[in-house]
């Protein structure tokens, strides 16, 4: 169950994260399972790192928050660059909700995928999010929140727009939108 938690300072203290840090989140796997080195290119971990490389020049106190298994590629790339990160490998849904709520930005950089679920989760928790044009991004996020890969820093989160649109996909109302969306695909 995902929801907004307004007091980020309490959450950051709980997870021992700096209140002055600009926290960017990524909660999906980024590495192929066969060798734990090769990037899972469909998830765009190289695009994530490219965006972080640009963003760190703008946000001097940038730190990355990662969750989930198979985060080897991003962890290795962040380590090479001496970019501070916090890795919470296996967490509960309650903890995941809290981690969304303490972020300054959630970044989806997938090249293709069905969801991603993170767009819905960030929307319902009012987490600032920008995303590549993938899956349901354009159904939930504003045009200004869609990343142009040529100018990635131009993307801007629109929290209220995403929160408003995600309401259409919550149960029970969400079943109608869900069926409508997938009937167009079939």
Q: What is the predicted role of each segment?
A:
Residues 111:
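Aromatic "clamp/platform" in nucleotide-sugar-dependent glycosyltransferases that forms part
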Residues 98-103:
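Short alpha-helical donor nucleotide-sugar binding micro-motif in glycosyltransferases
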Residues 3-17:
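A short helix/loop element that forms part of the nucleotide-sugar donor recognition site in Leloir-type
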Residues 144-153:
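Conserved acidic donor-binding segment of nucleotide-sugar-dependent glycosyltransferases
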Residues 119, 128-131:
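Short hydrophobic beta-strand element within catalytic cores of glycosyltransferases
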Residues 68, 73-94:
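Nucleotide-activated donor-binding/catalytic signature segment of Leloir-type glycosyltransferases, i.e.
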Residues 153-186:
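A charged, aromatic-enriched C-terminal amphipathic alpha-helix characteristic of glycosyltransferases
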């Amino acid at each position: 169950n995902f929801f907004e938690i307004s007091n980020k300072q309490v959450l950051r203290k709980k997870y021992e994260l700096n209140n002055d840090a600009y926290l960017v989140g990524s909660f999906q796997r980024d590495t192929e399972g066969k060798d734990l080195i090769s990037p899972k290119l469909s998830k765009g971990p190289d695009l994530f790192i490219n965006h972080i490389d640009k963003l760190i020049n703008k946000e001097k106190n940038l730190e990355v928050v990662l969750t989930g298994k198979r985060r080897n590629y991003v962890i290795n790339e962040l380590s090479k660059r001496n970019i501070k990160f916090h890795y919470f490998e296996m967490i509960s849904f309650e903890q995941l909700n809290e981690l969304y709520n303490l972020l300054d930005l959630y970044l989806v950089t997938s090249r293709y995928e069905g969801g991603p679920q993170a767009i819905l989760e960030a929307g319902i928790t009012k987490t600032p999010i920008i995303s590549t044009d993938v899956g349901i991004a354009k159904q939930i996020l504003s045009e200004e929140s869609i990343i142009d890969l040529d100018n990635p820093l131009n993307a801007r989160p629109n929290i209220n727009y995403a929160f408003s649109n995600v309401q259409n996909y919550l149960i029970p109302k969400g079943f109608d939108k869900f069926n409508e969306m997938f009937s167009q695909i079939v």
